[in-house]
Amino acid sequence: MRYLMLLSGTNPATPPPPELFEAIMKLGGEATEAGVLLDTAGLLPSASGARVSLAGGSMTVTDGPFTESKELISYALYEVRSKEEAIEWGSRFMKLHRDLWPGWEGKTDILQVMGPENFG
């Protein structure tokens, strides 16, 4: 099963500490070695993006930044055996933020990607 993990958070007053990046790289290496991490990348702030909306039959393009209070920060695509395994990887990632960047607040949404098993 594939799971997409989307990290979002507030824009804190302090930049992330270098130790956090080192720990994230180590965890990513471990997930890659285990064969479960398929792709991951950071995302630029929404100010550099756009949104295409459809409402009432009309399409609208809106340039960022978007008004949501939390920014999408990064994504990761995992292939794991179960939802529980996906949650374990996501939890480990969030624990790094808790332990190495006190005061930072955010969330990781873990969404299953549709696959052949969903079209039975």
Question: What kind of feature is each model-predicted range?
Answer:
Residues M1-G120:
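Conserved, structured core segments of small domains
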